[in-house]
């Protein structure tokens, strides 16, 4: 029995395993960066390829970070009410810093800052954290959970034949479900009634048949 043995060892020490999960989570978030002039741009945004066991192990950490960022979105929207459009260093910005609007903005922004610090503590990458809060979290506002999927790859990894898998965000590469068209029986019934109404009815035909039989 595997009592109190949650998780996978992955052939690493606890500190090495923790660093591995941090790097995988940051790598997935960083694929959503603006890589127009990046020489090492990701081939597909929102997707990384790793081993199957690593993907299963890092998925809960990715989901946890997204949930933390998503819960801070209402506070960020509340803080926008008291924000200023003035550039930093200008006289208007300095006046705003001394006003009560800045105090309200700082109070509304405090939960967002706490959430960002929590995610930085979990993954250790500030750039990935900013991408998570600015881009990824807004995508899953109406989704209660299940932000990622794992797709097994058919070809194993060269060298050790390890099972590979894709870890990606849902919503971008989803298959479109097409519903079959429902057959309409009302049109067929109406056409049959019209055909029966158009057929002529001859009352003398049965009488003629009976007379021929008597002969």
Please state what every model-predicted region is.
Residues 27-28:
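Short alpha-helical functional segments enriched in proximate histidine and acidic residues
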Residues 2-8, 19, 31, 43-202:
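Structured, basic alpha/beta domains of bacterial-type, RNA-associated proteins
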Residues 196-215:
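Intrinsically disordered, low-complexity acidic/polar and Pro/Ser/Thr-rich regulatory regions
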């Amino acid at each position: 029995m595997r009592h109190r043995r949650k998780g996978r060892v992955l052939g690493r020490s606890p500190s090495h395993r923790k660093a591995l999960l941090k790097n995988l989570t940051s790598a997935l978030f960083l694929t959503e960066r603006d890589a127009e002039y990046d020489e090492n741009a990701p081939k597909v945004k929102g997707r990384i390829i790793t081993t199957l066991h690593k993907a299963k192990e890092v998925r809960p950490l990715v989901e946890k970070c997204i949930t933390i960022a998503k819960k801070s979105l209402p506070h960020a929207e509340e803080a926008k009410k008291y924000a200023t459009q003035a550039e930093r260093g200008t006289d208007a910005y300095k006046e705003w810093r001394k006003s009560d609007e800045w105090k309200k903005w700082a109070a509304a922004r405090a939960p967002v800052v706490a959430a960002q610090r929590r995610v930085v503590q979990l993954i250790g990458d500030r750039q990935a954290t900013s991408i998570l809060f600015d881009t990824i979290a807004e995508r899953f506002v109406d989704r209660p959970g299940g932000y990622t999927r794992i797709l097994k790859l058919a070809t194993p990894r060269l060298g050790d034949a390890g099972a590979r898998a894709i870890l990606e965000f849902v919503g971008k590469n989803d298959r479109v479900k097409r519903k079959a068209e429902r057959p309409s029986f009302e049109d067929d019934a109406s056409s049959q009634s019209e055909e029966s109404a158009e057929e002529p009815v001859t009352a003398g035909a049965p009488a003629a048949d009976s007379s021929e039989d008597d002969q």
